[in-house]
């Protein structure tokens, strides 16, 4: 999935957009009779979170990413299971409580992305499978 325009988080945008493109392509194959059923069990989305100036931030912009104290990318399924968690302390080590807060925020952000993905799928294919 190519990211045409972004101010940061291109890897996360590619993961979330890539899932959406895959879902739409597979749904088209099901509708055409090429596939019997949609072979997806769950959705996938990714988001960046971090700490900038001592404050947790969701979906870091480029300027925030450049000065972040902590930078983290999280990839999750729609059911809240982790696919990838990659975090870096850019200057000083950080506490477990910061990790927990960033994971909580990432989960909330990914839930919003999933809702957008499912909205696009539903609008594209009326009555389409919204769960995966």
Spans of features found by a protein language model:
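Polyanion-binding surfaces on beta-sheet-dominated domains and ring/shell assemblies
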Residues: 1-132
